[in-house]
Amino acid sequence: MAFDGTWKIERNENYEKFMEAMGVGMMKRKLGAHDNLKITIRQEGNKFIVKEASNFRNIEIEFTLGVNFEYSLADGTELSGAWTLEGNKLVGTFTRKDNGKVLKAYREIVGDELIQTYIYEGVESKRVFKR
């Protein structure tokens, strides 16, 4: 599938503002902007296995399209939600457990890049990865 492979962070757009909107403290925002994140994605039908490796943590997440699951961000924020596939774009809708606010996430392949877009409380950020 198109998402399959290992992707390394290339650049961020508005990521610190997004983290600030999410309530991440200044020190963690500075560190998070330089996390050297590498994502490995494997798709098996409707099931995805995503491995995230960064300077701060290494985790593996398994999810099935359309099925709710629990997830914790690197700063400890707990979320519940699901990914769906809309055309060639993965669309995630997650609700924060602490305040009930919604985080939207998108993953799509554009050329040779994986673009992750986050939208929270009107703040949009992009993280761009290359294989």
Residue ranges of model-derived segments:
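Hydrophobic small-molecule pocket/channel-lining residues, especially in calycin-type beta-barrels
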Residues: 1-131
